[in-house]
From Swiss-Prot:
Keywords: Cytoplasm, Lyase. GO terms for cellular component: cytoplasm. Its EC number is 4.4.1.24. One of its GO terms (molecular function) is sulfolactate sulfo-lyase activity. Gene3D superfamilies: 2.30.130.110. This is (2R)-sulfolactate sulfo-lyase subunit alpha.
Amino acid sequence: MSIDFVVHDADDAVGVVVVEGVEAGQMLTGWVMDQDRTLQFEVKDAIPIGHKLAIRDLAEDETVIKYSVDIGRVVQSIRQGEHVHVHNVKTKRW
């Protein structure tokens, strides 16, 4: 089984895509590192390597956690498998 995305901590809200060519509709396999387990779901968007995807549904105003760190807040609801980027997450710094 090949790994398509990595999640560092089970409490994270996002994973990081580690392969090229991810297209909408693909079934992806992710590795949750701290629990050494995998999860699978269908990706909703094309997502470039190195970018984030939601590993669960995220509601507007929810905090996004990556690597156990608060990286911002959701400004538009995000479904599991969607691209998480500047169009739907904003920093809390300003």
